[in-house]
C-alpha cells in the first residue's frame, strides 16, 4: 500500500488572536505527553493562545469540549478552535472499538452541529510501538497534525465568514 502524504493547505487567512482549547485524555501519560508536545509546538509556531483541559479517557473528551466551550462563551472568552488528543490501544475486548468509534463520532457530531473548528488527534492503534510512532514529534507527530487541522479549519471558517 502506498504511503499517504499530507501537505498543509496554503490558506493564508490569519489565525492571529485565536484562542484554542486542547482537551487531552491522560489514560497513557507518557504517550499523551508526546501528543501534547506536538500540538503545543504547532500552536505556538502559529502564534495562537491555548488552554489545556485534561480528562480521564477518550470517551470523556467530547463532553469536556462542550463544557469548556459553553463556559468560555458565558465568560465572553470563546474558543476559536479545539484540538482533541488521546490514545486508544487495542486490547482483548470490544472496548477498543466502542471507544474508538464513539469518540470519533461524538467529535464529528460536535464539529458539524456546533460549527467547531476541530482537529482530532485521538490515535487508535494495535500496539504501544504504533502509538509511539504516531505520537512523537520527530515521527508521525499526530498531536501536531491535529493542531494543524484545527487551525486549517479555523482559517477556512474565518475566510468563509468574510465571503
From Swiss-Prot:
MF GO annotations: 6,7-dimethyl-8-ribityllumazine synthase activity
Catalytic residues in the record: 95
Protein keywords: Riboflavin biosynthesis, Transferase
Membrane-crossing residue ranges in chain numbering: none
Protein family according to the UniProt entry: Belongs to the DMRL synthase family.
Biological role stated in the UniProt entry: Catalyzes the formation of 6,7-dimethyl-8-ribityllumazine by condensation of 5-amino-6-(D-ribitylamino)uracil with 3,4-dihydroxy-2-butanone 4-phosphate. This is the penultimate step in the biosynthesis of riboflavin.
Name of the protein in its database record: 6,7-dimethyl-8-ribityllumazine synthase
Originating species: Nitrobacter winogradskyi (strain ATCC 25391 / DSM 10237 / CIP 104748 / NCIMB 11846 / Nb-255)
Higher taxonomy: Bacteria, Pseudomonadati, Pseudomonadota, Alphaproteobacteria, Hyphomicrobiales
Amino acid at each position: 500500500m502506498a504511503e499517504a502524504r499530507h501537505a498543509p493547505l496554503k490558506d493564508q487567512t490569519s489565525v492571529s488572536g485565536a484562542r484554542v482549547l486542547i482537551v487531552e485524555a491522560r489514560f497513557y501519560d507518557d504517550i499523551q505527553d508526546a501528543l501534547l508536545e506536538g500540538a503545543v509546538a504547532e500552536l505556538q509556531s502559529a502564534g495562537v493562545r491555548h488552554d489545556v483541559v485534561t480528562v480521564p479517557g477518550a470517551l470523556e473528551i467530547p463532553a469536556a469540549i462542550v463544557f469548556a466551550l459553553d463556559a468560555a462563551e458565558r465568560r465572553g472568552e470563546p474558543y476559536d478552535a479545539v484540538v482533541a488528543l488521546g490514545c486508544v490501544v487495542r486490547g482483548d475486548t470490544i472496548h477498543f472499538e466502542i471507544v474508538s468509534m464513539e469518540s470519533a463520532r461524538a467529535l464529528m457530531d460536535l464539529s458539524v452541529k456546533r460549527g467547531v473548528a476541530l482537529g482530532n488527534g485521538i490515535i487508535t492503534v494495535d500496539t504501544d510501538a504504533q502509538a509511539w510512532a504516531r505520537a512523537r514529534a520527530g515521527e508521525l507527530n499526530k498531536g501536531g497534525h491535529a493542531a494543524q487541522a484545527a487551525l486549517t479549519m479555523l482559517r477556512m471558517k474565518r475566510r468563509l465568514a468574510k465571503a
